[in-house]
């Protein structure tokens, strides 16, 4: 089965690579329209997936990721339209010039070919990835989690209908709907057909892909994100940022998981934090230094376990640790961070600059929420993933991350001397 999917995807990629921007946008507009027109079938399929997942004991955080609402589905369709409005990088001349030999040389952006994406209970990923791949002239093979099987099938059917109505092969967007995990291992060895693999899931999936894949892998999306509260920070403003970074949508990878508090601001800051977190329904996991103060406040607080500093809670839970200074905060982030998104809240711009320079994450913020690490927020449109590695992409992966380049030499029967 996968062999045939690979062949179909590779053949479709050749056709997609030749499309103009106008032709690709026409397909995307059709997909967005059909997602709204056929929303009832998609939402019904999703409701069945959610019911089964709840019966099987899926966590509330994962259920939130899985669930679609009419508003969320409309947002997904609008994201596709946003991709239409983005500049098409394919065909862009990056640089070039004329050599001494007279050969005119240019480096031009081209599609990667076929993208493989493995993901869990995130039905929006199906459309986000498909739209970005189509915009950049790439075919895609999707393997969603078993929790999303009905939703993905309904969504991909809509996308394939839109492709066919525009005269394009359905093989441009395909999904593996068999939940057999053995197919994941088989997919990881499809280097004959798949040019780049993107796993979007937990650490176990990433480890599996790194160890078994014969295809280049882009990993990321695991977000043990930190906020460091410097001693000069303005407490009222800090609380606004923390509420946003923790509670806006706790199940996302750019949600803050650990708060590092400078010891010189702890006495005045922790009581205010406890009050605010109690109002927000957040459970605090505090180190010994913070626990004594927080236990007298209104927020629910427990003693932090050492391993929780490495946890991506994806829930209304927040680690709180008192640190001696900026050096201590940076050392903690280096040990426990996942190079996703980390922030400093401060009025000391020298400390801010040190934090930016010394924290080696894909996104680093000064006086801002970690929740901004998102393709839409960065103006990239919907994202394929957030890469936390350094090759070949880093941070939110938009259109350019789905391209490579080729060198083109144009001569007049030019030969090398």
Curated annotation (Swiss-Prot):
Enzyme class per UniProt: oxidoreductase
In terms of domain of life, where is this protein from? Answer: Bacteria
Please list the GO biological process terms of this entry. Answer: L-proline biosynthetic process
Q: Name one Pfam family in it.
A: Aldedh
Q: PROSITE patterns, from UniProt? A: PROA
Q: Which pathway does it operate in? A: Amino-acid biosynthesis; L-proline biosynthesis; L-glutamate 5-semialdehyde from L-glutamate: step 2/2
Q: What does the UniProt record say this protein does?
A: Catalyzes the NADPH-dependent reduction of L-glutamate 5-phosphate into L-glutamate 5-semialdehyde and phosphate. The product spontaneously undergoes cyclization to form 1-pyrroline-5-carboxylate.
So what family is this one in? Belongs to the gamma-glutamyl phosphate reductase family.
Q: What is this protein called?
A: Gamma-glutamyl phosphate reductase
Originating species: Escherichia coli O6:H1 (strain CFT073 / ATCC 700928 / UPEC)
* Organismal lineage: Bacteria, Pseudomonadati, Pseudomonadota, Gammaproteobacteria, Enterobacterales
Q: Which gene encodes it?
A: proA
